[in-house]
Curated annotation (Swiss-Prot):
Gene that encodes the chain: Cfap298
Tissue distribution: Expressed in the trachea (at protein level).
Ion transport is among the record's keywords: no
Protein name listed in UniProt: Cilia- and flagella-associated protein 298
Family recorded in the similarity comment: Belongs to the CFAP298 family.
Taxonomic lineage: Eukaryota, Metazoa, Chordata, Craniata, Vertebrata
InterPro entries referenced in this protein's UniProt entry, alphabetically: CFAP298
Record function comment: Plays a role in motile cilium function, possibly by acting on outer dynein arm assembly. Seems to be important for initiation rather than maintenance of cilium motility. Required for correct positioning of cilia at the apical cell surface, suggesting an additional role in the planar cell polarity (PCP) pathway. May suppress canonical Wnt signaling activity.
Pfam families assigned to the protein according to its UniProt record, in alphabetical order: CFAP298
Cellular component, GO, one term: nucleoplasm
Keyword Cytoplasm attributed: yes
Compartments, record wording: Cytoplasm; Cytoplasm, Cytoskeleton, Cilium basal body
Keyword entries, A-Z: Cell projection, Cilium, Cytoplasm, Cytoskeleton
GO annotation terms (biological process): cilium assembly; regulation of cilium movement
Length: 290
């Protein structure tokens, strides 16, 4: 199996393995699904952390309004009254004004937070360092765990406009957000290796050869963005160690310059004529005018 270290730009994303005989059409789709799936997990984790702290999403027409404005406009959060967390709620006001402030109790909050940490770990970039391959099954498992935790804490479900529910139903609207810039459409995705685009009409082995023990770094890119930057000759960690070595070397040279003192040359042991004077018996003779 060929090992693919997938990157976006210079940033590591995940490890994937595939046979050399894999069609690049299929491989590009697989890499893109895992890449977008990881983004989805991270978006959900961010929103579920907010859910644990401040409760469900307010209706769009109530977001950002003060209590006085809501009362004046006679607006009502009907879904908020239905979607009550299991075990009761604790009021924690959302300063941003996106959520209704009726957060789950401490026990239910920990259920959400623990699940979020587990889901993050499953698709973390640290899996690259650990040598763990991330598959679409792992992404789906992380999503299922998050869905299960939300159902435990909110058995009545979430409002239809809550971004968590919309993510689970694949109805999320990312337009105008930073997250939209990160997502790559499957039909628009490109894989690059060694400054060459891996054409979808070919097989992986057409580029990397028949050796199934090959490990390559591929970069996923949106079509039309051009070739990604080449990989640096040394890694960021190696560069850091090199800079540290040169810094230490400069400090050592600086100390040597500071200690370059010639006063030691006046010491008796530095006098190369001392032995001669000793044998001639003229040691310690002081000359002074009368």
């Amino acid at each position: 199996m060929v090992v693919l270290h997938v990157k976006r730009g210079d940033e590591s994303q995940f490890l994937l393995q595939a046979p050399g005989s894999t069609e690049l059409e299929e491989l590009t789709a697989q890499v893109t699904r895992v890449y977008n799936g990881r983004l989805k997990v991270h978006r959900l984790c961010t929103e579920i952390e907010e859910l644990a702290e401040h409760g469900v999403f307010l209706p769009p027409n109530m977001q950002g309004l003060t209590d006085e404005q809501i009362e004046e406009l006679k607006l009502k959060d009907e879904w908020g009254e239905k979607c009550v967390p299991s075990g009761g709620s604790v009021f924690t006001k959302d300063d941003i004004g996106r959520r209704n402030g009726h957060a789950p109790n401490e026990k239910m909050k920990q259920v959400l937070k623990k699940t979020v940490e587990e889901a993050k770990a499953m698709v973390s970039k640290k899996q690259v360092e650990a040598g763990v391959f991330v598959t679409m099954e792992m992404v789906k498992d992380a999503l299922d765990q998050l869905r299960g935790a939300v159902m435990i804490v909110y058995p009545m479900g979430l409002p239809p406009y809550d971004p968590i529910r919309m993510e689970f139903e694949n109805k999320e609207d990312l337009s105008g957000t930073q997250a939209a810039l990160e997502v790559i459409q499957e039909s628009e995705a490109q894989l690059w290796w060694a400054a060459k685009e891996l054409r979808r009409t070919k097989k992986l082995s057409d580029y990397v050869g028949k050796n199934e023990k090959t490990k390559i770094i591929v970069k996923i890119q949106q079509r039309g963005q051009g070739a990604p930057a080449r990989e640096p000759l040394i890694s960021s960690e190696e560069h850091k160690q090199l800079m540290l070595f040169y810094h230490r070397r400069q400090e050592e040279l600086k100390k040597l310059e500071e200690n370059d003192d010639d006063s030691c040359l006046n010491s008796p042991w530095a006098d190369n004529t001392a032995l001669k004077r000793h044998f001639h018996g003229v040691k310690d003779i002081k000359w002074r005018p009368r």
